[in-house]
Amino acid sequence: MVSEENWNSDTMSDSDMIDSKNDVCGGASSSSGSSISPRTPPNCARCRNHGLKITLKGHKRYCKFRYCTCEKCRLTADRQRVMALQTALRRAQAQDEQRALHMHEVPPANPAATTLLSHHHHVAAPAHVHAHHVHAHHAHGGHHSHHGHVLHHQQAAAAAAAAPSAPASHLGGSSTAASSIHGHAHAHHVHMAAAAAASVAQHQHQSHPHSHHHHHQNHHQHPHQQPATQTALRSPPHSDHGGSVGPATSSSGGGAPSSSNAAAATSSNGSSGGGGGGGGGSSGGGAGGGRSSGTSVITSADHHMTTVPTPAQSLEGSCDSSSPSPSSTSGAAILPISVSVNRKNGANVPLGQDVFLDYCQKLLEKFRYPWELMPLMYVILKDADANIEEASRRIEEARVEINRTVAQIYYNYYTPMALVNGAPMYLTYPSIEQGRYGAHFTHLPLTQICPPTPEPLALSRSPSSPSGPSAVHNQKPSRPGSSNGTVHSAASPTMVTTMATTSSTPTLSRRQRSRSATPTTPPPPPPAHSSSNGAYHHGHHLVSSTAAT
């Protein structure tokens, strides 16, 4: 992921932004560097990749495409990272030229340091040669970023036929030797540029498996050896690297880039996931043995330490906050821009705010919740580490648990209360609705879960007359009828009784047919308790309605 420091740093000059427009967009921008008229304020490169035109100033931190992973935005991020490193080096060099030394300060190193800075300044384009193996080192923690750079210069020194007993180093040797080394390095880069283009394109979307063996075995380095004659140079494959690096012990703390780290970071922009910097300051670590043409080339820790202090001090003094810090961006900087959601308890979730709110909106639509529950969805999604599947699962579990609890409370409270009231003619809510809704009756609104109310006495509890059959036939129509005979809720006992009446109609019709067939036979008298407010009829309704459900 491109770090926030890299993209938000104001380290790009006008010419760099123009180059970025020309290279990323694939054509000339609206304002060219050669035009006489003053150039317009730059627009956001990421928004321009998606067809928008928004002024860059004040917009960078709020751009909706900050974490976009499309091809254009990845190229833009790599180019901006390289430009930031170049600008940091230029500022450090300008400060070294203008700043007067104070007490307890030492001047920069001999002209070899200037040569090294200028090499890092203009080697950005041809430095793709070693991007493939530097990329592999970045993918495993970012601590091996200087390995490819050091190995390349060692190969250049070997090709220059340096004496085996006195090899030339970056800063320890004379300025003439350093200049010849860098000159050969440039020639080597130019010679290999065409061959490296295809390799860079192949490695642009994939991170290669790289076996880093004996990681912490070469802390005690041996004097390095170089062959007297070497006719062919080749970039070592991934399996040839066995480098190890000790823990970073640079005194800069903030991770000011060393010269070799900056070069490795600069050269790694050829891959789409190329990192923006090496590990922390590498003053305590030495590169392990790398193999070139079957010959062991091992760098000592003391040899590599000489390249660190001066560039680190100059960068630390000039670009403490504006320049990107390789130690803070190593490892993660080489990954493609992605929405990482693996943070604990939602802390620092690098999701865009619009994406996060869009997830909350999807949860609302899935569970059909009102808009007022948006803050609740936000809290649930944040607690679930911005994982919408996990948040949905938690909400579903909570809903099932609440439904189970409501059903348990109803059975423990309302059903015994209905039985104690002594009204067997009323059907309890679960008995009625379970046949219609199955086991999901608790999804109905809670307003329907309430104890039954008493029925008015005038509807069905008229005293029975001794006339027998006429009393029975006259009592039945006295109960209110319903057009469809459905039950609306347990809160309306009238509808419940209506369903009981309609369900018992076939029984009454059978009785009437039997009476019409034998008119001389009197009907059997009702039981003795039938005169007590019509309880016989209510009991009959209860049995028939239960059977009907």
UniProtKB/Swiss-Prot annotation:
Residues 1-42, 129-331, 452-549 are annotated as: Disordered. GO terms for molecular function: DNA-binding transcription activator activity, RNA polymerase II-specific; DNA-binding transcription factor activity, RNA polymerase II-specific; DNA-binding transcription repressor activity, RNA polymerase II-specific; protein homodimerization activity; RNA polymerase II cis-regulatory region sequence-specific DNA binding; RNA polymerase II transcription regulatory region sequence-specific DNA binding; zinc ion binding. Disulfide bonds: none annotated. Residues 271-292 have a biased composition (Gly residues). Changing R91Q: Abolishes DNA-binding. Changing H59Y: Abolishes DNA-binding. Residues 129-152, 205-223 have a biased composition (Basic residues). Residues 44-91 bind DNA. The keyword NAD does not apply. It is found in: Nucleus. Gene3D superfamilies: DM DNA-binding domain, DNA helicase RuvA subunit, C-terminal domain. It comes from the Eukaryota. Keywords: Differentiation, DNA-binding, Metal-binding, Nucleus, Sexual differentiation, Transcription, Transcription regulation, Zinc. The keyword Phosphoprotein does not apply. Changing C68 to D/Y: Abolishes DNA-binding. It holds the Pfam family DSX_dimer. Residues 307-320, 472-487 have a biased composition (Polar residues). GO terms for cellular component: nucleus. GO terms for biological process: axon midline choice point recognition; courtship behavior; female analia development; female sex differentiation; female somatic sex determination; genital disc development; imaginal disc-derived female genitalia development; imaginal disc-derived male genitalia development. Residues 26-37, 153-182, 192-204, 246-270, 321-330, 456-471, 489-507 have a biased composition (Low complexity). Experimentally shown to bind zinc. Controls somatic sexual differentiation. Binds directly and specifically to the FBE (fat body enhancer) of the yolk protein 1 and 2 genes (Yp1 and Yp2). This enhancer is sufficient to direct the female-specific transcription characteristic of the Yp genes in adult fat bodies. Involved in regulation of male-specific expression of takeout in brain-associated fat body. This is Protein doublesex.
